[in-house]
Amino acid sequence: MQSFTLMSLLIPIPRKQTYQTFFNVNSESEIQGVYQWHQDLAAEAFLILCDFEVIFRSKIHQAMASLNCYPNQDDWIVSSRQQQNLVNKLQRDMLSAQQAGKDFYPDARNYNLHSSFQLSGKDRQNFINLICEYIKKGKNSFTHDDLVASVSFGFWVSLLKRLEGLKHGSLITQYLTEIFPHSTKGFDLNHLKSILDTLNRIKSFRNRIGHHDSIMRIPEPIAGHPDFYPRTVNQMINSLKILLLSLLDLVRDIDPQCSLAIEQSKNWKSFFLLLKVDSFQVYRSNSGNLESYVICYLNNSYNTFDK
């Protein structure tokens, strides 16, 4: 009976050849091994990114509330005083469309969120769509935590991007000081541009993992030069290490305790356990089976103990 691996069943031949060429392997078992190493790395990285997103969005939410709302309020997206009026209007319009036998497609220009921060038209539309989804599920009210948890990571990056358009540099300083209180890099436009560069790299990395794309050639920033794209396993390892450490730097600027918690997490340790040439070779030699990770773990434990 012929044996099929997950890779042979799911991966198109051109993509399979990409892994084969980049990792310089030939046999089916070696290809399966390096592919599984790549997948395990991506899986651990994604969990780290999830932790980062929660920390990042929570801090921005707090900063926006602090700078745009009354004390002890967090309604910078939708005014709490106007929330019920907004829900009622949407409910009426949804009912009217239903009675007319039409689908309901709300136009955000017809609804006022009474936001205390100037959102883009796209963002307003996204929030109106979210509120409509809540209503369809029978919710007549919602919290700002609901909204914060529902929007994409890209929303928070674009929100910071909009700070570039602030007319007064002092406003940029206020926002950056609130969001990254432990930074020592200065709270000006150059600092903001540096943060956005890192965030866009993280977002691109996150999207590649989310779409099951490869993370072999994540670009490495080179000051004053175009990005460098890895061509070997060693270069790939170095590029991923730089990216994850830049993520950790952002978290440290937000809250050093959070960065320490990430460093001590199982996902962080597992990622860097795998992000080694030795681990790559173990997976390559063992077809990426379950024992591959166990061997990597035992090798690391032995080396740590030996030191």
Question: For the regions a protein language model found, what residue spans apply to each?
Answer:
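Acidic/aromatic/glycine-rich contiguous surface patches that form carbohydrate-binding/processing clefts
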Residues: 212
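Active-site-proximal loop/turn and secondary-structure-junction residues that shape catalytic pockets
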Residues: 215
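Extended intrinsically disordered or low-complexity regions, especially N/C-terminal cytosolic tails and loops
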Residues: 1-197, 201, 219-307
